[in-house]
């Protein structure tokens, strides 16, 4: 704790408080005999969840860059882990606002466009298992669904529209649209989203962003399909 306080320039009491919170949540383990702290199980699980999806993100990188070039907006690629989305890839456009969706960040899925796009592809029973009661519905800015019934309504609209949308539930004054990537089994293992300033949200602008994002999602889905590899010697 002393070295952490020194390296971060924090009071020792603050460092101990942070460590106690991290320990309570499983991200830090206290080795009493060694008088040291180390990474906890939750930290390893978080890292392994990201590493499992790293090849998937690599597959999508080129498509994401083209999407940003086409629409001039920040784009991100995420997967669903329980109720959370994990951001695996972010491509930024010049002049666009900074986002909280850095690589490795987790956010509540029901508040994000990416999460809603993927949740819309799950069976109703699985959605119910993920959100058994009102305490499951974390809030960031007092916006977003607060009950299973409200979430189901949003997911129904998402399936009808073919894309998900959030307005200010993650960051005030910013909106996002997202399209799920569907594999050959019909599952939605990931989603691509584009974020824009809410004041830009005219019907024409959103329609264009959805079209670009949908094309990008279809391109990544196509790349996921197994294809025969030809032997150049035959």
What is each residue range found by the language model?
Residues 1-58, 218-226:
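N-terminal helix-turn-helix
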Residues 7, 58-70, 157, 161, ...:
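Amphipathic alpha-helical regulatory segments at dimerization interfaces
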Residues 33-34, 38-134:
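Amphipathic alpha-helical effector-binding/dimerization core
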Residues 108, 116-121, 126-130, 138, ...:
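Regulatory sensory and allosteric helical modules in signal-transduction proteins
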Residues 109-112, 207-226:
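Short, solvent-exposed cationic patches
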Residues 126-141, 217-234:
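Cysteine/selenocysteine-centered motifs that mediate thiol-based redox chemistry or coordinate metal-sulfur cofactors
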Residues 143-217, 234:
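Extended hydrophobic
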């Amino acid at each position: 704790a002393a070295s952490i306080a020194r390296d971060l320039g924090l009071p020792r009491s603050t460092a101990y408080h942070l460590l106690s919170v991290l320990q309570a949540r499983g991200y830090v383990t206290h080795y009493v005999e060694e008088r040291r702290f180390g990474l906890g199980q939750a930290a390893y699980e978080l890292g392994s969840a990201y590493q499992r999806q790293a090849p998937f993100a690599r597959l999508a990188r080129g498509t994401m860059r083209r999407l940003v070039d086409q629409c001039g907006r920040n784009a991100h690629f995420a997967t669903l882990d329980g109720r959370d989305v994990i951001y695996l890839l972010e491509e930024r456009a010049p002049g666009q606002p900074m986002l909280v969706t850095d690589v490795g960040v987790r956010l509540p899925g029901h508040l994000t466009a990416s999460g809603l796009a993927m949740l819309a592809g799950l069976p109703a029973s699985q959605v119910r298992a993920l959100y058994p009661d009102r305490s499951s519905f974390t809030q960031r800015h007092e916006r977003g669904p607060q009950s299973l019934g409200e979430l189901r309504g949003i997911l129904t609209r998402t399936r009808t529209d073919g894309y998900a949308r959030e307005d200010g539930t993650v960051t005030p004054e910013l909106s996002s649209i997202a399209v799920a990537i569907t594999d050959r089994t019909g599952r939605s293992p990931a989603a691509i989203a584009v974020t824009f300033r809410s004041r830009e949200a005219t019907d024409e602008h959103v329609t264009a962003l959805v079209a670009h994002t949908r094309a990008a999602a279809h391109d990544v889905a196509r790349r996921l399909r197994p294809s025969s590899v030809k032997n150049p010697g035959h």
